[in-house]
Amino acid sequence: NFYDTTDGGQVNGADAVRQPGSTLKPLLYAMCFDEGLLTPKTIMTDVMVNYNGYAPENYDKKFNGYVTVESALEHSLNIPAVKGLQMLGHEQMIQKMSNINFRQIQKDRRKLGLSLILGGCGTTLDELTGLFSSFANDGNYFAPSFIQSDTIFNTSKVISPASNYMINEILSK
């Protein structure tokens, strides 16, 4: 609150809840790889779809036809991501995110659906930082820490090393 005199109108940007846009797509695809639902070379269709009134679109409003998962992630295509979430089940994605301390996701879990993967949820910079650190740590999640310590707390396996490798290969192109 800008007019709150107790904090001088300051906002902690790292703790502010914001919609994450497409930043959850790497986690989704890694989870699909782990479940054996998809591989980077799996062909998906990027065509108009409608899920009971929910019709996701790509940012450019175009459809690309047949695309690989790798290409879908490289180009941040929305429709293949929604299809991937439908295959995986949004409940499984919500549970994984809850397990690594996505607090707003835990709070809103009953309201979330397929739009979750396109940013239809709330996350914080701290939560996303923790998630993306797992891609640099062989799929292991480490809770963000802002002080140097000899002890590592709150570690858990987010994705397998194999899926982690595939996602890192795609994201590094």
Where are these regions (language model features)?
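A short, well-structured edge-of-sheet supersecondary motif
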Residues: 1-7, 95-96, 100
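A penicillin-recognizing enzyme superfamily signal
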Residues: 2-13, 24, 124-130, 134-173
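Flexible glycine/proline-enriched surface loops and loop-helix/loop-strand junctions
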Residues: 8-14, 65-66, 74-81, 110-117, ...
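Active-site SXXK
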Residues: 17-44, 72, 131-135, 167
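A generic secondary-structure signal for well-formed alpha-helical elements
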Residues: 31, 35-40, 51, 88, ...
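Conserved catalytic neighborhood of penicillin-recognizing serine enzymes
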Residues: 38-93, 152-173
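Mid-domain, small-residue-enriched loop/turn segments at the edges of structured enzyme/sensor domains
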Residues: 55-58, 89-132
